[in-house]
Amino acid sequence: MKNILQGAMTALITPFKNGKLDEETFEKLIKRQIKNGIDVVVPVGTTGESATLTHNEHKICIEIAVNACKDTNVKVLAGAGSNATHEAIDFAKFAQSHGADGILSVAPYYNKPTQEGLYQHYKAIAESIDIPVLLYNVPGRVGVDILPSTVFRLFKECKNIFGIKEATGSIDRCVDLLAHEPNLVVISGEDAINYPILSNGGKGVISVTANLLPDYICELTHLALDEEYTKAKAINDKLYNINKILFCESNPIPIKAAMYIAGLIGNLEYRLPLCEPSSENFKKIEQTMKNYEIKGF
């Protein structure tokens, strides 16, 4: 299966207005990403607060993303994860039937399945659809690690599982995956290590920072993929401070604050249990942003 889901990808935030999904702003944010050269948009992932969306809201976000990207070269990698396999399959089937180019499926959270359980979970999802599936490994959030042996097994046996978004924070893990399976598509899931992963064989990034600075992330990613490593590293170094401050509290708390400060969202709203950043961190975010040129709509 030819992989078209790589390069510079944005883990989209989900804007709210008076407690409800702000569909108009969400569409505008996606069109801003398209305008600034992003390759793939990723709605309803961790950054999109998928855990606190209703199933209907989740599906609406996918529809908006697909419609916004229609007649463009930008692809949609739809979040379709759940800790219940039957729910993940429902999201996956919806994404496929509504035109998504692939799905991002986070490891089941809270119930801590075994490696065999993870294998069966992902195999069932992959067999339920025909579009590409990107595994999503983020043990710090979900409580379970998709071990390399399980990744290789799934990659070998499921034709539409093409790679993994690695958010372990470990460059060594990514290098090990690629050393044992060079055809596996490894995507960086942490902005702090985008450059090291790209320069060691990674094929793209799913970036939180790209919500705010899509042009920077596009340039960094494309330069690295073209093996222009000196230029890519210079951009990566410039992004160091913003990448750091955007994770001063749990994602997506800081990035939504930054988007609000930049005037890209009109309301600073979260779904509980997420809440606004501390006043101290809000000021730090605001101060750090002054060092970057942030493009509007």
From Swiss-Prot:
One of its GO terms (molecular function) is 4-hydroxy-tetrahydrodipicolinate synthase activity. Pathway: Amino-acid biosynthesis; L-lysine biosynthesis via DAP pathway; (S)-tetrahydrodipicolinate from L-aspartate: step 3/4. It catalyses: L-aspartate 4-semialdehyde + pyruvate = (2S,4S)-4-hydroxy-2,3,4,5-tetrahydrodipicolinate + H2O + H(+). Its EC number is 4.3.3.7. Pyruvate binds at T47, I206. The record marks T46, Y110 as: Part of a proton relay during catalysis. It holds the Pfam family DHDPS. Homotetramer; dimer of dimers. This is 4-hydroxy-tetrahydrodipicolinate synthase. It comes from Campylobacter curvus (strain 525.92).
